[in-house]
UniProtKB/Swiss-Prot annotation:
This is Translation initiation factor IF-2. The gene is infB. PROSITE patterns: G_TR_2, IF2. Residues 482-484 are annotated as: G5. Residues 1-44, 62-251 are annotated as: Disordered.
């Protein structure tokens, strides 16, 4: 078997269908009868299987490899033969020594002609053999190349034919009706092409013509269909190419540098990292934090999240402007000695303000409501040629924050303790504030003129809190004074001046001023008013002051007596007008050079405070979500607080919030400094709140709204009364308690049977009163065996409503007949008990 025949045998087999083939298919008609349908196939289709395609490709590769190997072998063989022939020629051309060496001159001359002729013939034969070998090798190489080319073309035709037949591969999978319709369409199109283009005669009956065979016609139809299919594909390709998008999705997310400020929302962080916000929320859930898309994150948390997701973080300080404004100071100014700032602290009613009155020679205590101080008073006095600034703080428990502020702003604390009262809770608290601020203490034992005064007891009690007198080896000066009579006051001032000399207090006098807000309030005529204690520099009229969230130019300054002044040096308290709003007590007040920058810093602080507050509220909402759901209904008392000064507002709001219990919560809907306005009244009406005015009054428009809406408005000037009335209002909102009170006891002496009531107990009332309509208990051996009510109560034959102690009666117990002699019947009533906080 030749190689060509072997390749033909290995070629993939193809299935050919006849042009005309009939078959019968049984089908069911609509009536349910069987019907035979003849199916005729008129197309020649060649179906190549996938195995055949693979075999063709394998054959092509194998043939190409064999042809290349054969050509290489033939070329090597030809080279080898050529080399052998060359060696033979060289050997023949080289004469042997015997031949080359003539025996003698006569032998050389008489050479044999036959020998020369034979040599020439051998050389000619060798040349012809070389030529034949070369031609044979070239012919074999050419044949091998042609075979390889032929095999490659055959394989290519096989693949192309397989692609052409794809359109017809599902021919036998369609129904006979569809195939007949397709064949009819093909015949019609074929006849149209034949008559229109080629101008040939009509086909004979049976679909044949004289010029073409069956195979040619089928090939024509196939070519026409292929051309139509290619046209469609090219159109679709063009249309698809116009709609193709130019975007390609990156294979990997780029990790960029993320700039994070002091606060950033989850959405902003996701935007900077070019990821979805849900990824950040998932990451934080893994870290144990529940957040929402709008939640504000602090810088540290945002940094952790960004680094967790593989980004490099660049931290940015957003308060750079604030720092630059505050650092722009006079650094080379000379420091001079300044006056001490003294805060007078102690328990309520121990005589702090009265002591300060005597020092100032002014009757301030009489002007305070109820004789107690409601806010910080700041005064400076001159004694022995030296100035001392006094801060008078409230002693009531509600004013803790005020006392803390006073201790922070001060140099020396004068602790006033009543000699007849001793150490009290606010005395202890004042000691703690002074210790926390690191401020030395001078103890003034007041009310020494009272007969029941016992200053030694005060000294002993203060030892428990590490306040050791100098006579006990400590460093605390004790001065006995009487604020009423003025005894010992000069000694107290000397002690203060001595303590200030020890502290060596200095401050810059001529530089830009800075200080602290002691108190602030809203004056209806003058606007926001802040009491500022200057701590360094000199505050002048016209200076630009940055004060917490507020800023402004100083329009006017007044001292504690209400006199206008133009400047105030270190340790001098002044009232300042001209701020944009009411600053919070305790804020730092700083003079800056540029009003525009001051406004920017104030706005930045407001925005930052708002973000932090929002973040805190959001966190509280998420953390307390389930606890709030489980609490159920809790009564709420809504309150709106308006007061004359900021410190009083803080104290009242804090005290009200501390009144909250598990059953009733006080919710401060609104608070502020200044008079009660129409806006406050409208808010109270909308939130159903109580309005509380502390040393303020409502204006005319607010009073109209209050009358129309029937709002509960209350005025106070003493914080005791305010808190007591709020407690009473909260007590009214508590759920009442019910208590059972025993009102009578009867002992069973005999049992009678009654046809209507059953067992009737003949009883003697031993205690209290037995009433007809009250609930009862039956006791046997002091154990309750039944609880119910009376069905009848008789005395002799008369029905009565009650029987008193020491009288006999007949008692019928409803739904209970097992009463025995010796049992006790206990009569009680349910009493509602009002609760209070």
């Amino acid at each position: 078997m030749t190689e060509k025949e072997q390749n033909a045998e290995n070629a993939p087999k193809k299935l050919s269908l006849k042009r005309r083939e009939k078959t019968t298919v049984s089908a069911t008609t609509a009536g349910g009868k069987a019907k035979a349908v003849q199916v005729e196939v008129r197309k020649s289709r060649k179906i190549d299987t996938e195995a055949a395609i693979k075999a063709a490709e394998a054959a092509k590769l194998k043939a190409q490899e064999e042809a290349e190997a054969k050509a290489k072998a033939e070329a090597e063989k030809a080279e080898q033969e050529k080399a052998t022939a060359a060696k033979v020629r060289e050997k023949a051309a080289k004469p042997t020594k015997a031949e080359a060496k003539p025996e003698n001159s006569t032998v050389a001359k008489a050479a044999d002609p036959e020998k020369e002729k034979r040599k020439a013939e051998e050389a000619e034969l060798r040349r012809k053999a070389d030529e034949l070998a070369r031609q044979k090798a070239e012919e074999q190489a050419r044949k091998a190349a042609e075979d390889a080319k032929r095999y490659a073309e055959a394989a290519k035709d096989t693949v192309e034919h397989h692609n052409d037949s794809d359109d017809f591969s599902d021919y036998h999978l369609t129904s006979s009706y569809a195939r007949e319709a397709e064949d009819e369409d093909n015949r019609r199109r074929e006849n149209h092409i034949r008559t229109g283009k080629n101008k040939v005669t009509k086909a004979k009956k049976g679909g044949r013509d004289d010029n073409g065979s069956k195979d040619e016609r089928s090939a024509d139809r196939r070519n026409q269909k292929d051309m139509r299919g290619k046209g469609k594909q090219s159109k679709q390709g063009k249309r698809g190419s116009t709609l193709q998008q130019a975007f390609t999705k990156p294979a990997q997310v780029t990790k960029s540098d993320v700039v994070i400020g002091e606060t950033i929302t989850v959405a902003e962080l996701a935007n900077k990292m070019a990821i979805k916000a849900t990824e950040i929320i998932k990451t934080m859930m893994k870290m144990g934090e529940m957040v929402t898309i709008n939640q504000v994150l602090d810088q540290e948390t945002a940094q952790l999240v960004a680094e967790e997701l593989g980004h490099k973080v660049i931290l940015r300080k957003e308060n750079e402007l604030e720092e630059s404004v505050l650092e722009d100071r006079d650094v080379n100014a000379e420091k001079v000695q300044r006056a001490p700032v003294v805060t007078i602290m102690g328990h309520v009613d121990h005589g702090k303000t009265s002591l300060l009155d005597y020092i100032r020679k002014a009757k301030v205590a009489a002007g305070e409501a109820g004789g107690i101080t409601q806010h910080i008073g700041a005064y400076h006095v001159e004694t022995k040629g030296k100035i001392i600034t006094f801060l008078d703080t409230p002693g009531h428990a509600a004013f803790t924050s005020m006392r803390a502020r006073g201790a922070k702003a001060t140099d020396i604390v004068v602790l006033v303790v009543a000699a007849d009262d001793g150490v009290m809770p606010q005395t202890i608290e004042a000691i703690q504030h002074a210790r926390a601020a690191g401020v030395p203490i001078v103890v003034a034992v007041n009310k020494i003129d009272k007969p029941e005064a016992n200053p030694e007891r005060v000294e002993q009690e203060l030892l428990q809190y590490d306040v050791v007198a100098e006579k006990f080896g400590g460093d605390v000066q004790f001065v006995y004074v009487s604020a009423k009579k003025g005894s010992g006051v000069d000694d107290l001032l000397d002690a203060i001046l001595l303590q200030s000399e020890v502290l060596e207090l200095t401050a810059v006098k001529d530089g830009m001023a800075s200080g602290v807000v002691i108190e602030s309030y809203l004056d209806k005529g003058r606007g926001p008013v802040a009491t500022i204690l200057v701590q360094s520099g000199t505050l002048k009229r016209g200076d630009i002051v940055l004060c917490g969230f507020e800023f402004g130019r100083v329009r006017a300054m007044r001292d504690e007596d209400g006199k206008d002044i133009n400047e105030a040096g270190p340790s001098i308290p002044v009232e300042v007008l001209g701020l944009s709003g009411v600053p919070a007590a305790g804020d730092e007040a700083t003079v800056v050079r540029d009003e525009k920058k001051a406004r920017e810093v104030a706005l930045y602080r407001q925005g930052k405070f708002r973000e932090v507050k929002l973040a805190r509220q959001q966190k509280a909402k998420l953390e307390n979500m389930f606890s709030n759901m489980s609490e159920g209904d809790v009564a709420e008392l809504n309150v709106i607080v308006k007061a004359d000064v900021q410190g009083s507002v803080e104290a009242i709001v804090q005290s009200l919030q501390e009144l909250s219990t598990e059953e009733v919560k006080v919710k401060v809907v609104g608070s502020g400094v200044g008079g009660i306005t129409e806006t406050d009244a409208t808010l109270a009406a909308a939130s159903n709140a109580i309005m509380v005015g502390f040393n303020v009054r409502a204006d005319a428009s607010a009073r109209r709204v209050i009358e129309n809406e029937n709002i509960d408005l209350r005025y106070y000037s003493i914080i005791y009364e305010l808190l007591n009335e709020i407690k009473a209002a909260m007590s009214g909102m508590l759920q009442p308690e019910f208590k059972q009170e025993i009102i009578g006891l009867a002992e069973v002496r005999d049992i009678f049977r009654h046809p209507k009531f059953g067992a009737i107990a003949g009883c003697m009332v031993t205690e209290g009163i037995v009433k007809r309509n009250n609930p009862i208990r039956v006791l046997r051996d002091n154990v309750v065996i039944f609880e119910g009510e009376l069905e009848s109560l008789r005395r002799f034959k008369d029905d009565v409503n009650e029987v008193r102690n020491g009288m006999e009666c007949g008692i019928g117990v409803k739904n209970y007949n097992d009463v025995k002699v010796g049992d006790q019947i206990e009569v009680f009533e349910v009493v509602e008990v009002k609760r209070s906080i």
